[in-house]
Amino acid sequence: MTAFNVVRFRVKPGRENQFVDEHRKAKSDFPGLRHAALVKTGERTYCLVGEWDDMSSIVGAREGMIALLDRFRDTLEDLGGGLGVTDPVSGEVVLDLKR
């Protein structure tokens, strides 16, 4: 069943170009990843949205996704509330509204 992951970020002042460039250079060839997009949601805030074949594909890619995060972790601000520099969520699609 199709699954999505969404990761929320807040970038340090003056580091947005580096943050976006690291995503541009990234090899997003994780098995099961259908589509991924980096979305600017506000001033210095972004979400990465990934569409996957299934939850097991997301689980299998976690190590690689963490390695990718480590390349630009220093560009990120702590989100507070014990979250650290990312706020990730993932889950299976329960209703496909439009294709």
Give residue ranges: language-model regions:
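An amphipathic, aromatic/His-enriched active-site/gating alpha helix that lines ligand/cofactor pockets
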Residues: 24-35, 51-87
